A protein has these predicted regions:
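Conserved acidic carboxylate
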Residues: 10
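Short hydrophobic/Thr-rich beta-strand motif most characteristic of the beta2 strand and flanking loop
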Residues: 27-34, 42, 78
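Acidic catalytic/metal-coordinating carboxylates
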Residues: 34-38, 62-66
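Active-site residues of response regulator receiver
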Residues: 55
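Receiver (REC) domain active-site loop signature in two-component systems and cognate sites
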Residues: 58
Length: 123
C-alpha cells in the first residue's frame, strides 16, 4: 500500500518545512504549498492528493476560502486545519466538521488528526 498523499499549505516557511519533515518521517507523501494559489495549482497537478493540512490565516486566500474553492472541484478532499488561534469559538459554522489542530503542535497531536481525517468516509 502506498503512502497517503498530503498537501501541506502554510505561508510560514519554517512551520511548513518542519511539519513536512514530521509528516514524511511518519510515512506520508507530502507536497508543500506556500499559498492558496500554489495549493490550487498543486491539486490540479496531483490528483492523488487525499488530504490537505491547511493554515487558517494566510495572505491573499484564507484556509477557509481555499477549502471552499477546492471542494467546488474536488468535494472528496478532506482537510485538517492548523492555527495559532487558541480560541476556536469564532469558527463555529465556518468549517462544518473539519478537524482543527492548534499551533504549536507535535507529531503526537497532528498524527491522530491526520489519521482521523483519512479514515472518515468520503463525502
Amino acid at each position: 500500500m502506498s503512502a497517503p498523499n498530503l498537501l501541506l499549505v502554510d505561508d510560514n516557511d519554517d512551520v511548513r518545512e518542519v511539519t513536512a519533515l514530521l509528516l514524511r518521517d511518519g510515512g506520508y507523501s507530502v507536497i508543500e504549498a506556500s499559498s492558496g494559489v500554489a495549493a490550487l495549482a498543486a491539486l490540479d497537478a496531483n490528483p492523488a492528493i487525499e488530504l490537505m493540512i491547511v493554515d487558517f490565516s494566510m495572505p491573499g486566500m484564507s484556509g477557509i476560502e481555499l477549502l471552499e474553492r477546492v471542494r467546488a472541484k474536488r468535494p472528496e478532499i478532506r482537510a485538517v486545519f492548523i492555527t495559532g488561534y487558541v480560541d476556536h469559538t469564532w469558527l463555529n459554522g465556518k468549517l462544518a466538521d473539519e478537524i482543527v489542530v492548534t499551533k504549536p503542535f507535535t507529531m503526537d497531536e497532528l498524527a491522530p488528526a491526520v489519521r482521523k481525517a483519512l479514515s472518515e468516509p468520503d463525502i
